């Protein structure tokens, strides 16, 4: 058993719609993508960074394929913007894409909440689905009973609340339980992890409501887990690099894509 080996111990959120496509509703009478450059109808499209290589060839194909609407050529202009940043800029009116492809459907719901109006539809097609998981150093996972015993969010919450930390499992040298997740304001994995934490606190697997988030009991549970966060990284790659460089005691578990 290598102390440096990282294992996936639990699916945090079953699937993230990483290829989601939203056709955004405009607040004016434009009715859609009709910004003109010369004679062309320009369709402004914003995509999250992980899909740039997937969608760029499709954009080139459309732009070079002679697509027309109402007798005018159509040109797609694609901008690459992280989902969290795009959410903020759309709400602020800094960008008005006709098409938005964030890293998760959660961003569309958050956009509508922050804008206080339905800019993104409730249902949109998803091109790709990827899991969000909890990763742990293998010795830590085995100390919790993995793989014979399942490790879930309730396990992590209990460990975060424990005053004894890893000493309760015969490993005081590992120190307290330390959790890692990315910033939910900007990162998809961080946002998804926070939603999963509230679902666990509410005793649900899906169907999180605003009442669940506002419930004092659930907020206390999530707060206790968040207090164990060692660092809010910008990306999950940061945690992977730190775990490799600093060893297993840097963090006990990380929510990762």
Which residues fall in each region the model found?
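Polar helix-capping/helix-linker motif
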Residues: 162, 187, 212-216
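Hydrophobic alpha-helical membrane-insertion segments, chiefly the h-region
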Residues: 7-9, 13-25
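Short, low-complexity patches enriched in S/T/P/G
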Residues: 1-7
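Extracytoplasmic/periplasmic solute-binding protein
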Residues: 170-202
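N-terminal segment of the mature folded domain
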Residues: 31-175, 183-186
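Helix-boundary/low-complexity linker signature
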Residues: 1, 25-26, 36-39
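Ligand-binding pocket segment of bilobal, Venus flytrap-like solute-binding proteins
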Residues: 196-257
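A short secondary-structure junction signal
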Residues: 146-147, 190-195, 208-209
């Amino acid at each position: 058993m290598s102390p440096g080996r990282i294992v996936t111990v639990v699916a945090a959120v079953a699937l993230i719609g990483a290829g989601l496509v939203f056709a955004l509703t405009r607040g004016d009478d434009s009715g859609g993508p009709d910004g003109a450059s010369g004679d062309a109808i320009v369709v402004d499209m914003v995509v999250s960074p992980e899909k740039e290589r997937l969608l760029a060839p499709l954009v080139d194909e459309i732009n070079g394929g002679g697509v027309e609407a109402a007798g005018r050529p159509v040109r797609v202009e694609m901008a690459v913007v992280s989902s969290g940043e795009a959410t903020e800029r759309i709400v602020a009116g800094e960008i008005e894409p006709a098409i938005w492809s964030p890293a998760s459907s959660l961003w569309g719901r958050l956009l509508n909440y922050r804008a206080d109006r339905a800019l993104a539809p409730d249902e949109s097609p998803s091109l790709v689905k990827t899991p969000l998981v909890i990763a742990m150093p293998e010795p830590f996972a085995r100390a919790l009973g993995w793989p014979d015993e399942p490790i879930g969010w309730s396990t992590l919450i209990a460990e975060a609340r424990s005053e004894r930390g890893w000493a309760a499992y015969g490993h005081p040298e590992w120190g307290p339980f330390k959790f890692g997740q990315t910033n939910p304001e900007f990162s998809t994995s961080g946002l998804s992890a926070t939603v999963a934490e509230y679902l666990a606190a509410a005793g649900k697997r899906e169907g999180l409501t605003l009442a669940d988030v506002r419930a004092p009991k659930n907020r206390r549970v999530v707060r206790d887990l968040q207090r164990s966060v060692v660092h809010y990284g910008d990306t999950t790659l940061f945690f992977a690099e730190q775990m490799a460089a600093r060893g297993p005691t840097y963090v006990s578990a990380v929510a990762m894509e």
